[in-house]
Curated annotation (Swiss-Prot):
It is an enzyme of class 3 (hydrolase). Mg(2+) binds at residues 83, 87. This is Uncharacterized Nudix hydrolase NudL. Signal peptide: none annotated. GO terms for molecular function: coenzyme A diphosphatase activity; magnesium ion binding; manganese ion binding. Keywords: Hydrolase, Magnesium, Manganese, Metal-binding. Probably mediates the hydrolysis of some nucleoside diphosphate derivatives. Pfam families: NUDIX (PF00293). Residues 29-160 form the Nudix hydrolase domain. NCBIfam families: PRK10707.1 (NF007980).
Length: 192
């Protein structure tokens, strides 16, 4: 599938046609969720954040809004929506959730569930300075181009795992964020 002319309707029909298979087994017990905010435009965008530099984990990294599930969250989707509101001021009622991707294991011991949602283009999103240093929009068509991601095999604690790397403008997109974007591309039928 060629992503260069990806419209929102095409993305939605492909995502809903090819439902994710939730067969992923994990040993992780801690749950987290991220929102993949797709901006409703004829040529859709993807809202991403850059984490604040003072954070203990993943400082300065490009990420989706999200975080750990807490005891007040009714579901993984509720956790993703709460975190998106806290981090970038996206009201939960403004998000049209269209589905979830299979969970991904993080190197920090979380099982992370990506929640795909459509958001209006005119939301006055803003970064929570405690958690986020920047909020930016990337064209969805570019984010889903598999050729933009480059593999790097990393050895950590005696184990090898593959990390994906990419750039968008001056932002370095890698790790879990790049992996989730690749999984989303594969989910809608983009061929490697």
């Amino acid at each position: 599938m060629d992503t260069s002319r990806l419209t929102l309707n095409h993305f939605l029909s492909r995502f809903q046609l090819l439902r994710p298979q939730m067969t992923h087994e994990t040993l992780n017990q801690r749950q987290a969720a991220v929102l993949i905010p797709v901006v409703r435009r004829p040529q859709p965008g993807l809202l991403l954040t850059q984490r604040a530099i003072h954070l203990r984990k993943h400082a300065g990294q490009v990420a989706f809004p999200g975080g750990a599930v807490d005891s007040t969250d009714a579901s993984l989707i509720a956790a993703a929506l709460r975190e998106a509101q806290e981090e970038v001021a996206i009201p939960p009622q403004a998000v049209e959730v269209i589905g979830v991707l299979p969970p991904v294991d993080s190197v920090t011991g979380f099982q992370v569930t990506p929640v795909v949602g459509i958001i209006p283009p005119n939301l006055p999103w803003r970064a929570s300075e405690d958690e986020v240093s920047a909020v930016f929009e990337m064209p969805l068509a570019q984010a889903l181009q598999l050729g933009r991601y480059h593999p790097l095999d990393v050895y950590r604690r005696g184990n090898s795992h593959r990390v994906w790397l990419s750039w968008y403008e001056h932002y370095f997109v890698w790790g879990m964020t790049a992996n989730i974007l690749r999984e989303l591309a594969l989910q809608i039928g983009v061929k490697p």
